[in-house]
Amino acid sequence: MTDYRLWSNTNTTNTCDDTMMMDSFLSSDPSSFWPASTPNRPTPVNGVGETMPFFNQESLQQRLQALIDGARESWAYAIFWQSSVVDFASQTVLGWGDGYYKGEEDKNKRRGSSSSAANFVAEQEHRKKVLRELNSLISGVQASAGNGTDDAVDEEVTDTEWFFLISMTQSFVNGNGLPGLAMYSSSPIWVTGTEKLAASQCERARQAQGFGLQTIVCIPSANGVVELGSTELIFQSSDLMNKVKYLFNFNIDMGSVTGSGSGSGSCAVHPEPDPSALWLTDPSSSVVEPKDSLIHSSSRDVQLVYGNENSENQQQHCQGFFTKELNFSGYGFDGSSNRNKTGISCKPESREILNFGDSSKRFSGQSQLGPGPGLMEENKNKNKNKKRSLGSRGNNEEGMLSFVSGVILPTSTMGKSGDSDHSDLEASVVKEAVVEPEKKPRKRGRKPANGREEPLNHVEAERQRREKLNQRFYALRAVVPNVSKMDKASLLGDAIAYINELKSKVQNSDLDKEELRSQIECLRKELTNKGSSNYSASPPLNQDVKIVDMDIDVKVIGWDAMIRIQCSKKNHPAARLMAALKDLDLDVHHASVSVVNDLMIQQATVKMGSRLYAQEQLRIALTSKIAESR
């Protein structure tokens, strides 16, 4: 296993152009992301701490490496998304905390899928160019053909390596993206298969599928979310989740964490004191042996000593979380940067450790950074004026490229010989005004209704509004019978057309209803007149000849109708029915007549010709026609 490191023989001071480029590459003022500092704790000059911090860069790097190397599955990378709060009113933001890249086991999978060889070569040149410029930006060596930088980045950059690099530029609001959803729901998210990744609503999952990944896992922990990715199909494993919960409990001493290549790992727990009482430490060595995947870590505590006018020794320990935005597009470089003697590679190899974080105006051989910036108090008697220190170490033997978002581990300026083989320590103190947290004004107004939760901020309110709007669209789509397209505009257009169609049907039904009422009134008048005339013209005995007990039942199905008439057999009711059907322009498909004693039952199946009758209309028309024939 090879560490992702930058070797340097001389200390290099960047010029103004490098400083401007660095400010554009990294966030220049992360102080707004830091939480309030903890109280000072004075330390003796020659004292040495006994324990490591429960959450620092070395510990986090070891945990990620132990998680991958000790797993039975073949994971390509591991990323720890660190949770932080931008301000007092916003939600939690997940940003890059640290990452460990191992690579694929199968070397045949390293080559990304490209449409043509020319596109593949152009893509590789672009990736190598970005890595060379990133290397020259950090090391102070301008990328050119004469300094050996091109030879240093000669191996192809795989898709998984590139996906791992661009992940440093991403951040997730609580509830958005796979890491944000895992943090919001406090439950792991396991996506396996290219189809599920491509169909996911998360842009990061679709991007991972495009870069050849087949499995992505996001497991929440106390301080953030652990993400693992693989180019193989790996199904859900409770053993992995238990390891994450155990390894990323930051009260565990990582000096006793060991992992084996066979997939078994064991961790020993040592009690740690209160984090507020821990000293700032400077881990001096971290050796990783790839043969048995054993992780050994040793650290020595270096205390910060600052002299003021009263010769008082003070130390400030605080932790903060902040996010970085890295831009991997092309950068322009001029010849103002100091050059190193050798070309340095910034490309992560297989099973490499890659860290990105804050940097200062000056760079020595090795920048030792931990998980957050350290703030030092200058004097207790000076109205709480504070100083910020960024410690950097120079080592002639090795330099480690470290971009870490987290607490900076500052080093002291205690006396050491310039000819010593160990790195010299420098401490720069910058005065900084105290930023008092603004008191959030209390909201005035009515309380929300019972059972309705008040949104935390405008982002949550907008999210709830969009969810409610989407639910209404789903309900509308369910009631509209014919939907041309699935977009919202087409759905609204189809709904409007359907509503207009229903309105026209209602209007036609009202017109038919009025027409039927008028016909019924006319029939009543005619029947009344005929009844009175027949009563006066014929004797009472002939009144019994009329079809008084005639029962007509009509059922209409489309253009077909079924007619059933039950009446007396006197005065030829079958002939009167056929005459009525002829007058109404109804074609007879089937007809039957049966007689039981004095009762005649007629059944007929007809088809409407020129006019479509409703059920009640046809019954009234048949009644009137048979009565007229009578």
From Swiss-Prot:
KW Ion transport (keyword) present: no
Subcellular location: Nucleus
InterPro entries on file: AIB/MYC-like, bHLH-TF_ACT-like_plant, bHLH_dom, HLH_DNA-bd_sf, MYC/MYB_N
Disruption phenotype: Altered morphology of type VI glandular trichomes. Strong reduction of volatile terpene synthesis in trichomes. Strong reduction of the expression of terpene synthase genes in trichomes.
Inducing factors: Induced by methyl jasmonate and wounding.
Paired cysteines (S-S): none
Spans annotated as Basic motif: 453-466
Basic residues bias locations: 440-449
Swiss-Prot/TrEMBL keywords: Activator, Developmental protein, DNA-binding, Nucleus, Stress response, Transcription, Transcription regulation
Domain bHLH: 453-502
GO MF annotation: an example: transcription cis-regulatory region binding
Main location per the UniProt record: nucleus
Coiled-coil residues: none
GO-annotated biological processes: positive regulation of DNA-templated transcription; regulation of DNA-templated transcription; trichome morphogenesis
Segments for region (Helix-loop-helix motif): 467-502
SUPFAM superfamilies: HLH, helix-loop-helix DNA-binding domain
Region called Disordered, residue ranges: 356-398, 430-463
Bias (Basic and acidic residues): 450-463
Source taxon at top rank: Eukaryota
Tissues/organs with expression: Highly expressed in trichomes and at lower levels in leaves and flowers. Expressed at low levels in roots, stems, leaves, flowers and fruits.
GO cellular component, one term: nucleus
Function: Transcriptional activator that binds to the G-box motif (5'-AACGTG-3') found in a number of promoters of jasmonate-induced genes. Transcription activator involved in the transcriptional regulation of terpene biosynthesis in glandular trichomes. Binds to the promoter of the linalool synthase TPS5 and promotes TPS5 gene transactivation. Acts synergistically with EOT1 in the transactivation of TPS5. Involved in type VI glandular trichome development.
Protein's name according to its UniProt entry: Transcription factor MYC1
Source organism of this protein record: Solanum lycopersicum (Tomato)
Encoding gene per record: MYC1
